[in-house]
């Protein structure tokens, strides 16, 4: 019975992340929504690993790998956003066309 609750929560987090990513106009908010999506995927991996793969822990190891990649992605993304903010004085996605001067 706990499997259904974990999957519903993960689907809810994933849906919130997708909705926020589609409707977000701020780059920092879009990065946060992307992190929410990755956390929902990690929750699915750990849940399925717990219920269906008790001995090998492949899902747990893979989720730790995803967390490390997500941390690097967040650091690089925030560095890019801060650089864009320093140059353009805005973090709005629709105002930051980097191909124009």
From Swiss-Prot:
Annotated Pfam families: Oxidored_q2
GO molecular function: oxidoreductase activity, acting on NAD(P)H, quinone or similar compound as acceptor; quinone binding
One Gene Ontology cellular component: chloroplast thylakoid membrane
Localisation: Plastid, Chloroplast thylakoid membrane
Enzyme class of the recorded protein, top EC level: translocase
EC number: 7.1.1.-
GO BP: any one term: photosynthesis, light reaction
The organism's place on the tree of life at top rank: Eukaryota
Major location (coarse): plastid
Tagged with keyword Translocase: yes
Membrane topology designation: Multi-pass membrane protein
Purpose of the protein: NDH shuttles electrons from NAD(P)H:plastoquinone, via FMN and iron-sulfur (Fe-S) centers, to quinones in the photosynthetic chain and possibly in a chloroplast respiratory chain. The immediate electron acceptor for the enzyme in this species is believed to be plastoquinone. Couples the redox reaction to proton translocation, and thus conserves the redox energy in a proton gradient.
Family designation: Belongs to the complex I subunit 4L family.
Protein name per its UniProtKB record: NAD(P)H-quinone oxidoreductase subunit 4L, chloroplastic
Native source organism of the sequence: Ipomoea purpurea (Common morning glory)
Name of the gene this protein is made from: ndhE
